[in-house]
């Protein structure tokens, strides 16, 4: 089972990963938690380049191909072996992030992005993609608070420094994908409390994947809100 989590900056998706994995584990699903970019040794170096605000002059194509390189290594080293071993993979961002950040927001053609996906990812597709929908104003306010509280670091804040219009294009890009692939996407309202969002996630997984996760415990929730 392959589950991906997507959303704008500050949508709270990262906060939900640990309780989700704990819930899966309690129900007999051995889960591997991973993320993009930066899930491998090579990927961590690519992540540092991509998210460094000092790299504001990075070209859109450079950004696109760096994400593709990170994903190629990630698939080879983490995702494909885990799925092959029968494990559940829970991934914080995947191909949809490229489609909306580099496509809808940056303006790179869908044709080029699709070509890169076909080379790097081939026919692998998540069983379920959970989209944490949130307005950019609220999301960016959360990220500012996280930076102030030391829960995020300034050396990974390049995307947080983009304009509000950029983040709105990201949000609308995600919603367009969800509308086009309703069988794959589960859209959750990220404005709710962490407990409300978690409950919505688990009930959605049960409904969409035909499984029965039980034993939901609000104590699983990390009190911090991240993107």
From Swiss-Prot:
<dbReference type="GO" id="GO:0005524">
    <property type="term" value="F:ATP binding"/>
</dbReference>
<keyword id="KW-0067">ATP-binding</keyword>
<dbReference type="GO" id="GO:0006233">
    <property type="term" value="P:dTDP biosynthetic process"/>
</dbReference>
<keyword id="KW-0418">Kinase</keyword>
<dbReference type="InterPro" id="IPR018094">
    <property type="entry name" value="Thymidylate_kinase"/>
</dbReference>
<keyword id="KW-0808">Transferase</keyword>
<dbReference type="Pfam" id="PF02223">
    <property type="entry name" value="Thymidylate_kin"/>
</dbReference>
<dbReference type="GO" id="GO:0005829">
    <property type="term" value="C:cytosol"/>
</dbReference>
<dbReference type="GO" id="GO:0006227">
    <property type="term" value="P:dUDP biosynthetic process"/>
</dbReference>
<keyword id="KW-0547">Nucleotide-binding</keyword>
<dbReference type="GO" id="GO:0006235">
    <property type="term" value="P:dTTP biosynthetic process"/>
</dbReference>
<dbReference type="InterPro" id="IPR027417">
    <property type="entry name" value="P-loop_NTPase"/>
</dbReference>
<comment type="function">
    <text>Phosphorylation of dTMP to form dTDP in both de novo and salvage pathways of dTTP synthesis.</text>
</comment>
<dbReference type="InterPro" id="IPR039430">
    <property type="entry name" value="Thymidylate_kin-like_dom"/>
</dbReference>
<comment type="similarity">
    <text>Belongs to the thymidylate kinase family.</text>
</comment>
<feature type="binding site">
    <location>
        <begin position="7"/>
        <end position="14"/>
    </location>
    <ligand>
        <name>ATP</name>
    </ligand>
</feature>
<dbReference type="GO" id="GO:0004798">
    <property type="term" value="F:dTMP kinase activity"/>
</dbReference>
<keyword id="KW-0545">Nucleotide biosynthesis</keyword>
<protein>
    <recommendedName>
        <fullName>Thymidylate kinase</fullName>
        <ecNumber>2.7.4.9</ecNumber>
    </recommendedName>
</protein>
